[in-house]
Amino acid sequence: MQIFVKTLTGKTITLEVESSDTIDNVKAKIQDKEGIPPDQQRLIFAGKQLEDGRTLADYNIQKESTLHLVLRLRGGAKKRKKKTYTKPKKQKHKHKKVKLAVLQFYKVDDATGKVTRLRKECPNADCGAGTFMANHFDRHYCGKCGLTYVYNQKA
């Protein structure tokens, strides 16, 4: 029977084989026609690499089937050296979750039961109601919009 072998260059070779022929025999015939040594040849059919000891019938290769010839690659990527770090890894800041943290922004008067705000609220329309400004030693600062009020310095 006749089979086709497509090479890397796109050239198609026709080979006269029998279904009982081994893959070794096919590789030898390719060497006769193309001059590529069998140890460098890899034959692929239906997405599978053909093993040397098996026959064409094992892979269900019939007349006028096309095998793909690719060359065997040697070696691989260069092995990389593992990095050694001189300093220990920096610890990430962990956010502390405080339950009912909102209560520290308000104070309830015991006598009247009136609620007063302990922090200044941001007047910017982008921030909206309930956005408090941070108290620093010399200023009030809104973390949302960046608005800053600086205290008057006494000379």
From Swiss-Prot:
SMART domains: Ribosomal_S27, UBQ. A zinc finger (C4-type) spans 122-145. InterPro entries: Ribosomal_eS31, Ribosomal_eS31_euk-type_sf, Ribosomal_zn-bd, Ubiquitin-like_dom, Ubiquitin-like_domsf, Ubiquitin_CS, Ubiquitin_dom, Ubiquitin_ubiquitin-like. GO terms for cellular component: cytoplasm; nucleus; ribonucleoprotein complex; ribosome. Keywords: Cytoplasm, Isopeptide bond, Metal-binding, Nucleus, Ribonucleoprotein, Ribosomal protein, Ubl conjugation, Zinc, Zinc-finger. The keyword Cell wall biogenesis/degradation does not apply. One of its GO terms (molecular function) is structural constituent of ribosome. There is a cross-link at G76 (Glycyl lysine isopeptide (Gly-Lys) (interchain with K-? in acceptor proteins)). Pfam families: Ribosomal_S27, ubiquitin. Residues 1-76 form the Ubiquitin-like domain. It comes from the Eukaryota. GO terms for biological process: translation. There is a cross-link at K48 (Glycyl lysine isopeptide (Lys-Gly) (interchain with G-Cter in ubiquitin)). The keyword Acyltransferase does not apply. Ubiquitin is generally synthesized as a polyubiquitin precursor with tandem head to tail repeats. Often, there are one to three additional amino acids after the last repeat, removed in the mature protein. Alternatively, ubiquitin extension protein is synthesized as a single copy of ubiquitin fused to a ribosomal protein (either eL40 or eS31) or to an ubiquitin-related protein (either RUB1 or RUB2). Following translation, extension protein is cleaved from ubiquitin. In the N-terminal section; belongs to the ubiquitin family. In the C-terminal section; belongs to the eukaryotic ribosomal protein eS31 family. This is Ubiquitin-ribosomal protein eS31z fusion protein. It comes from Hordeum vulgare (Barley). The gene is MUB1.
